[in-house]
């Protein structure tokens, strides 16, 4: 198994843990790994309680070597997510009262339970 395969596996595990967590909050998954020429949206969910669509960036970490939660999503990344969200919305027939960008960070490592942090409204 290559380092790339390992990273992809860790990322996929983190994303699944994030989706399970979001569904546990009562959010409904609309899309996963939506791609276009400008990038990818990790997870798109509906918060039916407030008629909102939420675009969720999932960051999975095995160490803090590349920064923690605060460094997970930069202003440049937020701008890119906004653009992608707009493109995704333009393809939808449904309309929502509000739109939100969230981040879920997942820390996983050997011998410990995964730790999830959910930051709502990052941009």
From Swiss-Prot:
Cited PANTHER family: UPF0102 PROTEIN YRAN
Name by which UniProt lists this protein: UPF0102 protein Mflv_4140
Domain of life assignment: Bacteria
Family named by the database record: Belongs to the UPF0102 family.
Species of provenance: Mycolicibacterium gilvum (strain PYR-GCK) (Mycobacterium gilvum (strain PYR-GCK))
InterPro entries the record matches: Restrct_endonuc-II-like, tRNA_endonuc-like_dom_sf, UPF0102_YraN-like
GO molecular function: nucleic acid binding
SUPFAM superfamilies registered for this protein in UniProt: Restriction endonuclease-like
């Amino acid at each position: 198994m290559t380092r790339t395969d390992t990273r992809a596996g860790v990322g996929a595990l983190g994303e699944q843990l994030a989706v399970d967590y979001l569904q546990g909050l009562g959010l409904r998954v609309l899309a996963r790994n939506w791609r276009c020429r400008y990038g990818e949206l990790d997870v798109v969910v509906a918060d039916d309680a407030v008629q909102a669509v939420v675009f969720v960036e999932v960051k999975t970490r095995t160490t803090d070597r590349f920064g923690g939660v605060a460094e997970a999503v930069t202003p440049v990344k937020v701008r890119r997510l906004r653009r992608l969200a707009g493109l995704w919305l333009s393809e939808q027939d449904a309309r929502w009262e509000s739109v939100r960008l969230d981040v879920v960070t997942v820390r996983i490592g050997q011998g410990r339970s995964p730790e999830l942090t959910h930051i709502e409204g990052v941009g």
